[in-house]
């Protein structure tokens, strides 16, 4: 099974924390869509005939794209790839874009999962992050989608925001739960260079929360959501049973996927490809770059993706994929983490307990192989 990803990079305004590739020049929407259709045609053989299981529109703000244009991309893809078994089609959306009329056309087009970028139900926090909706609009967007018949809705929340502590976070979690959504992604705020927050931090006007605050807020997220019946299945992701994000799971398990649009990434099982991060250059036909994954790359990605999930590393699978020596080394390197209970080993699987997944990156680094890679081309 394979996945399709469509990158719509446009935004009406830039959020204070965002370091993804985006553009605020909405006049380029039509030329971009034409180029995306051309790319679909040009890469029709990329997935090697594998059935497409998931389709995902990310950004940027895909909900700025007319629903008819979303339908056009899906319909075109269906003529090139085997999409008959597609079971999850997700569109990322800003709350203020989700009008009843928009939702109705989108659903008829085949979108059956919405990812709503709420981030907070606190208006002051939303203003700080330069979001263009308020809490009331967020609530109404989800309710409108539910009235339209959407039964698979995920919302994004951000924690670790300076000046907004446990009480604000708890209210946002409670508000999300009260809406009856099936999935919640809770991301820790990162202050990246080149963002509004990053520039303020460089001037000494904005400071990230400390480690203790991060751990306390993460524990609150974990306890609140698991207490409400959600499965904590990946560092930042929580789902009711049966509603885990299938498209993201494809990335974590090495499934083939084709990315369409500027800055989109693809994987054909052997090589990674990525498009130029420029609307102008993409429309101009700039070729994708490529990297052949070495055995070391595949091992590092395996460790990284598995240890960010509740499933963890299946040591028998690791031995089958990478050999007995590597699997034995993983177990040896894990000893300090196992002794501290930061890693647990049960039934041949080694994982970070979900409540402690915030530290998974530090654990993952233990296992990385760092010899130089010369496979980029």
PLM regions and their residue ranges:
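Short, amphipathic alpha-helical interaction segments positioned at domain boundaries
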Residues: 355-377
């Amino acid at each position: 099974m394979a996945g399709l990803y469509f990158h719509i990079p446009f935004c009406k305004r830039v959020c204070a924390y965002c370091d993804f590739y985006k553009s605020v020049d909405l006049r380029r929407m039509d030329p971009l869509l034409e180029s995306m259709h051309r790319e679909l045609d040009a890469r029709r053989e990329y997935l090697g005939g594998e059935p497409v299981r998931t389709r995902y529109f990310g950004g940027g703000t895909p909900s700025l794209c007319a629903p008819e244009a979303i339908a056009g991309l899906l319909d075109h893809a269906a003529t090139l790839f085997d999409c008959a078994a597609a079971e999850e089609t997700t569109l990322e959306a800003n709350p203020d874009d989700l009008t009843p009329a928009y939702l109705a056309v989108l659903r008829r087009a085949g979108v059956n999962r919405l990812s709503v970028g709420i981030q907070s139900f606190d208006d002051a926090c939303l203003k700080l992050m330069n979001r263009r909706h308020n809490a009331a609009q967020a609530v109404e967007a989800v309710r409108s989608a539910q009235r339209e018949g959407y039964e698979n809705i995920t919302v994004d929340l951000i924690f670790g925001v300076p000046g907004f502590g446990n009480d604000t976070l708890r209210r946002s979690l409670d508000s999300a739960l009260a809406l009856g959504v099936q999935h919640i992604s809770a991301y820790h705020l990162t202050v990246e260079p080149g963002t509004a927050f990053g520039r303020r931090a460089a001037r000494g006007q904005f400071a990230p929360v400390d480690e203790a605050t991060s751990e306390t807020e993460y524990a609150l997220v974990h306890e609140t959501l698991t207490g409400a019946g959600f499965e904590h299945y990946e560092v930042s992701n929580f789902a009711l049973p049966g509603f885990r994000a299938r498209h993201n799971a494809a990335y974590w398990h090495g499934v083939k996927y084709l990315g369409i649009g500027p800055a989109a990434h693809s994987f054909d099982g052997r090589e990674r490809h990525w498009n130029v991060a420029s609307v102008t250059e993409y429309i101009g036909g700039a070729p994708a770059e490529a990297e052949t994954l070495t055995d070391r790359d595949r091992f590092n990605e395996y460790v990284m993706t598995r240890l960010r999930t509740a499933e963890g590393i299946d040591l028998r699978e690791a031995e089958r994929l990478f050999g007995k020596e590597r699997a034995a080394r993983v177990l040896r390197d894990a000893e300090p983490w196992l002794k501290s209970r930061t890693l647990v080993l049960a039934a041949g699987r080694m994982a970070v307990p979900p409540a402690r997944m915030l530290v998974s990156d530090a654990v993952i680094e233990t296992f990385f192989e760092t010899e130089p890679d010369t496979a980029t081309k």
